[in-house]
Amino acid sequence: MSLSQQLKQINEKSASVALDRKSRSKLHSKSLIFAPKVAATQDYDYLHSVGVDGLTELCTIDSRFLKFQQTLFADSTVNFDRNVQTKEIVDNLDASIAAFLNLVSPFYPLSPAVKAVEWLVRRFYINIHNSEALILTCLPHYQSQIFARVMNVIPKSSWPPIFNWLNGYRDMSKNPPSSSILKAFRNDYQLFKLYSEYITQQVSVETVYKEQLVFYLTNTIQLLASYSTDIEKLNEVYLPVILEVIGKFLLASNTSLDHDIKIAAYTLMSVVVSLVPLADDVHISLTRSILQVPGAFDPQLKRQTMIILAQTWQRYTGAKFDFEFFNTIPLDSLLKDNLLESLVHEGFDFNNFLLALISSTNDKRTLSLAKLFKIERANEAVATTFISRLIDAASFKPDTEARASIVAAFEAMLAGSRDTLVEYLGSKKEPMSLADLEMVLLTTLSSSDVDDSEINVAQSDEVQEANGSSNSEPVTLDGVKSHTKSFLFQCEDFNDLSRLLVSFLAPFESNSYANQIAKFCAAVFTGPNASITFTLRCSLTPIIPLKVRLACLICLKRKLKELAKSGDTKLHLILPILILGLYDDHQSIRAGFAESIHSLSTPSASKNASIFLEDEMYADVAASNKVLISPKDGDSLINLLTSTDSLLKETVLDKTRLVSVLFEVVFKAQQPSKKFGLVCQTFFIAQWSQLPFAAVFKSLIFKIMSGRNITAECPSRESFIKGDVAGLFSGYEAWMASAQESKLDFESDIVSPLVNLVGGQDELSTPNSSEIDEVGWLIKATDFTKCPVIQVAATKRVTQVFEFLKPEDKVRLYSKFIELQASDDELNFDAQEILQAMPLDFNSALTLLKNFQLVAQIPEQQIPKRRRRSSNSSKQTMAHEELVSIASVHLRKLTIVLDLLEYNLRKNLKEIKPELLSSFFGILTDLEYLGHDGDMPVLYTQEVLATCMLLAVKHIKAINENGSGRISIDSNSVRADLIVNTIRSSNSPQIQNRLLLVIAELASLAPEIILHSVMPIFTFMGAHTIRQDDEFSSFALQDTIAKVVPALAKSGASSFSNEIEFLLTSFVTAFQHIPRHRRVKLFSSLSKTLGAGNSIHTILFLSGVQYASLFGKGKHGDCLSLLEFTQGYMKQFQASEQLSAIHKFCTLWQLVPTKPLDPDSDEFRNLNSRPIFGASILSLNDTELVELKAGLITFIDSLLQTDEESVGYLQLRVNQLLLDSHSTDGEKTIIIDGCKNVASLLLGSLDNFGQVSKMTKVSDNLYQFLDDILSLLPLVYFLDSIIDVLKNPMGVDRVAINFARLAGNKIENELTASNLDEQIQFSLFEKLVPVLISGIKSNQDAEISQAYMDATAQAVAKLGNCTTCFNEAKNVSVLNECLSILTSESGLKSSKPECIISSMNCISSIINIMGVKAIGFFPKIFEPTVEIWKTTKTNEEDMQLVQTSVLLLFAQLVKKLPAFVTSKLDSIFTCTIGSLAVDATVRSSILSSIVEYVDTAYVLKALCNVWGEISKSDNAEVIGLYLGAMEKTIDQLEKKSAISQATLFIKWMIKAFEFRSSVSKSSQDFDTNTIHRLESSFHSCGLRYVMKLNDKTFRPLFAGLVRWAVNGEGSTSDTDEVSRYIAFFRFFNKVQEQLKSIITSYYSYLIDPVSSLLKRIDTMEDSINLKRMVFNSLTSSFKYDQDDFWSQPSRFESICGPLLQQIPTIENSIGKYLVKCVSAFVVNVSSEEHNEKLVHGLIHYISNEHSTTNSHTKTWTIRILKSVFQKMGDQWLSYLPTLIPYIAELLEDDDEDVELEVRKGLVKVLENVLGEPLDRYLN
């Protein structure tokens, strides 16, 4: 084991060991449940109780958790520490933890599981020691929150490397997506292998769960799919693992998830075999594994097993298909439920599997599955092999069942692909044709359609010997003898003889079949009669191979020719049988029978010739019932058929022509006698119907007769109805057996033709004593459950003959099928489909409805009630079980009838009468009783009835509108009250909606009936329908209103308006219950139906009342919802309609009283009669009425108000219409008049409310509403509408004030250079501005003057910005006049602050336009403004507004008149900086403007001038603004100006440096930080200014500063020396940092003062701070000295001594600054002479020889030496011998601190410089 591995093991074992409190707390804070801070404080007792609680709950879910109560969750584990346990105990612990995690894995999303795992995390640190198992068990829950928690509790040091791909999600505390899981599985084989092994282990220990299986399946399937393009890697790497998993899954015996595990295995196997081309032995191995799965063929798994077997064998490419393991398949289970058949039908390919199964097993039952082989899907090798296996099976004389299975298989192949089968048969080693195959199978293939070209049968009449035979063993006829005389009838031995014949012929070639048949007949039969009838029957029997049938036909023809030639026999009796052969499906058979008919002619027959087969055929027929024709007529009949070749040729080519030949030619022949045809028909029909022919003959007879019956009248069918049809019910089993023996299709060959004989194009017979009830027979047939085939055929026949039935028979059939549909019996046909196929006429419909109507008399119409109450007696009566059953059946039948009626009403019901409606209402009453009294489920029936009523009413309307007739509706036919009652009582919205649609349709058809119930309808719609959130309800509601309201209006009812108001009130009342997304559409369509003029204002008023109520209750969300709806609703209408509605709204608003009304007053009665007012408004008190009126105005005004970002919809429409050149004058007039009408009404209301104090809120809202109404108009129209009001304001005219403000706002917001035209300019300058100026001059009222001034300012500003009109002299004169007024008592000199503020605002706007043209007014403006500013200090009420206005005016003056304000800058600065009520950012901006626009030299001078006053301020913000302005001024100042103003600036700087001193002596209360910030600004100003000066200018100024600092020269205050030095060095140090070496020489002015200062500094106050600054100053000078300034001896001597003399007195707090200073000095003056002096100077302070030496001096001197040696290095090594004795002495100093300083500091540095220990030198 490597060292790294050993270290890793040690780390893992000690990962949960915490050696200090901090790490222990961090380790303990990892929790799945608690926050880290909470978890860190929890003890193990509490955590154990949490875990036990979780485990207890888990035990109730799964008892397997019980075993952990005594292990992991035992009480003793509270004190368990895994870090001190033995390896064996730890291993057992890990095993228990793994077992628990496996078991708890499915329950991770549950709280108990998290609690239990929490204990394991906190006590056993499974997040550290079992982190891999923890992640593995939790991985299927990667999308849940628990997975993120699990990742979070695992420390990075313990994170399993195999899960490093999760680190990113762990750090972000996010769940990984499924794509990341898949990517990890795909890119990391080891991870996939690990999880595969883990899940197989889970399966083996029975802890796997569904989610885990789904997780593994999902990712594995996607993994396989991703490698579909890299099969090689998939086979090498992943496939072995997956196959191993499949194998273990298949063998799993998990009791709970056995089925799911096997399904998972099947799924994986399915994907594998679909994607990967496996070797054949793998397919075989997989199959063997599947068949060994326990329970693979159990019912719940059998389907999946067969599917996977099919998929596995679908890819098998081997040649071997015989495997023993297929014998283990339980065939009984496989054949049960037709499973394979259904799977094949679903598209699964079982070809290879079927071949393997049939090849591997000897059980004949497997042959029954051969029919499922799909030859069209199979490859050639598989198909050929399969066909060969079947042929071999057929050749070994299989039993009947096996042969039938083989035949069924070939027939299925023929149906699937005939050409493919023929191709594969031809490709065999011994090629075969279909005819050969039929001979092998000893039967005819029903789908073979063998062509004549495939038949090689000798056609010669001469007897030929066989040319050869096949290798098959011939069949012997020894002992075979038949005594049957005729085979025309059903006989027992025919089937055996026919099979013997086919077997007898099998060894021979087909061209000798006829001769061999002759031999067979000669050997078996005793006479020609038997031979002829046998060959005849064989010729028409489908089960016999076609080759044999043709050969029999040849033999028959030979026999008939022989008899005809003999002349002793008349053959005409057999003619009807031979004619049947002309209806065979094969043309070759039909041709043979045609030739046989030609052979019947016996022209030389003797008169005494016998009639062939007469005795055999008619032996059981009484002589009186025999219907024969004479031999002569027989000859004539034969001659008729054979004389004209075309007759028989037609039937040979087309068998259907036989019907026409018989019924149109033969049966209507009039030669040799007129009744010859009738005689022939009688003969044929009698023989066909009387004689019990075999099924093969009867089938053809039925087909011929039914073919005639379907196409034309066929009275002769009656003979068959009495016989065969009547006996079908009793003899169907015999028919079925005969059909099966002959391979006839029982349905198509027997039943259908026979049933088609019932009924026809003539009326069906009615029951009487002599005739059969054909309708009754059909009814019985439809109910004949013993034979479903007869049922289905009868139902089809019913639909065919229905139109020829009598009305009463139609009703009988309707009733029968309704009964069948209503029954619970399983039917073999769709009764409803049959009912719909039988067209329903009006009379039948009416009869059916009456049959199912319970109440004979509809109850009388009464006053509508809320709901009909069910009586207890009725309920008790209906509670009987028998009655309930009867009622249920009745209801079911009634529903079927109504469904049928609905179908026919939609399709083809033409005639309709009011009686039908009457029946509907009777049924409606029935359903009410059944629903309420019987508690029956009548909802669907009611819905269908409502639909029928709706369709019927629509039909009647269509008839009336088409003019084809007029159907009148009266109260006997229509009962609106019943509809209303049903609507009210029903709980189904669908029924309610449909009945509302019925009401809608009846409204125009019978308005006088419906309108009596209109109020309850409206009430119901408002209370219920309007709340439904579906399209149908919405449509029903709108359609009802759309049709009822016009009818209501057309009726001319006086209460129309009240009813409309009632409707709208009910709708708006339910507003909150209407689905939000349907509100606008509903009410807009409602308004369009009612008419905009009749409804919009009412809806607005009712909405406003709701808004006021909601607002008063504080439901602002509902208020907002109501406003949103109303805005969307109003957008649906034209602008003129909206304005008209607003006007009408205001009219309604005026009707709302302001105080309660007297109930006896007319006004009260009038309002109370109107639904929109009513008691809800009239019952309010004074305060509530005022609130209502105010709320209504607020509501309507909210619809008009806009914001800065958008324009109101109505305003947009109004502007669009008025400004559009295409709009007509009439349209514009309507809009303008609409606004004026509303404005006039509001002005009138203002006159009423303006003087009433309690109506102030109402009047305020009215003013705002009036403003918003006028705002709708474009600017030009608006100005024209308000000019008159502005001209003559009366007193405090709120209207004029609002109009002026509104005008200003509209000008500000709407006027732009692009839309300013001459018309607007004229209105503004020629109309508005003069009126405003005149109003200001009149000085009537402060508020009016203020509004006029503001409007003037806005108008002038906009005009000045958008036009150049003020360049004209006449317009300038207007502004001059305005300025004159504004600077008079009406403006600046006014005593009213509001007028002063507005006047300054207006002056600013005018100056902005006029510029220097306003210079004449400058004195009139500036001085009063300054005086106004001064007054603000005494009048604090309006201080902020006035000061702001003053500053803004100053800013405008500075911008437009910069040259003229220079003399006033002092005042401007004082006012600006001193306006404390104005925000500092505003003042700063104005100061910046002054600096920008005015010459900076004047600005600097003014700033210096005002400093004296500014410095006295106790507001730091004021001084900060001043200094900010100073900095900006200096930045803008040119160098030339800076030099010229330098002396002034230095004087200002000296004053600024003295600021700290003056503050300390004054009452100014500044904290130290504030003073530091201000001084920093002083220094910043000084530095900025110095940077603009040259040396020539700055040097004398600097000398002056030095003199000020040293002597106080130029001081304006009695500042002490220390303060001056401190202020000076603060500034000078910053200058040094900026100018560096440039200013080093300036120290010549400071050497003597500094030297002197250092010598006496210890005696000064605040010496420490000053010392630090001096040291820093000297350090900077030494550091930046590049010209050996300090190396000059005099300078060195001046500073060296005073500097070293600071060592004894240096304070510890600033000692480091002295060290830096001295070391920098040494570095700077480095020369032998200077160094020698410095060394001895420093030795002085470490040598014990001097009395001044002490531990303090030694310590700081040592530190200086240390720093010097660090910087000088080798340069000072020459002085080491001088210093060594003193160092040695210091190392033995009595003061340990000194010794330590030397040993750890100086000695270390010296050794570093020397590169060797210092001990050698010390010794």
Swiss-Prot record:
Q: How does it assemble?
A: Component of the ribosomal small subunit (SSU) processome.
Task: Give GO terms: molecular function aspect only.
Answer: U3 snoRNA binding
Name it: U3 small nucleolar RNA-associated protein 10
**What broad class describes the main subcellular location of this protein?**
nucleus
Organism of derivation: Meyerozyma guilliermondii (strain ATCC 6260 / CBS 566 / DSM 6381 / JCM 1539 / NBRC 10279 / NRRL Y-324)
> What's a GO cellular component annotated to this UniProt protein?
preribosome, small subunit precursor
Give the family this protein belongs to, as stated in its UniProt record: Belongs to the HEATR1/UTP10 family.
Which key words are in the record? Nucleus, Ribonucleoprotein, Ribosome biogenesis, rRNA processing
Taxonomically, which superkingdom?
Answer: Eukaryota
Q: What intrachain disulfides are recorded?
A: none
PANTHER family cross-referenced by the UniProt entry: BAP28, HEAT REPEAT-CONTAINING PROTEIN 1
Task performed by this protein: Involved in nucleolar processing of pre-18S ribosomal RNA. Involved in ribosome biosynthesis.
Tell me where the signal peptide lies. Answer: none
InterPro entries, sorted: ARM-like (IPR011989), ARM-type_fold (IPR016024), BP28_C_dom (IPR012954), HEAT_type_2 (IPR021133), HEAT_Utp10/HEAT1 (IPR056473), U3snoRNP10_N (IPR022125), UTP10 (IPR040191)
Localisation per UniProt entry: Nucleus, Nucleolus
Can you say where the HEAT repeats lie in this chain? Answer: 1779-1817
- On whether rRNA processing is a keyword of this UniProt record, the answer is yes
Q: What's one GO BP annotation on this UniProt entry?
A: endonucleolytic cleavage in 5'-ETS of tricistronic rRNA transcript (SSU-rRNA, 5.8S rRNA, LSU-rRNA)
Matching SUPFAM superfamilies? ARM repeat (SSF48371)
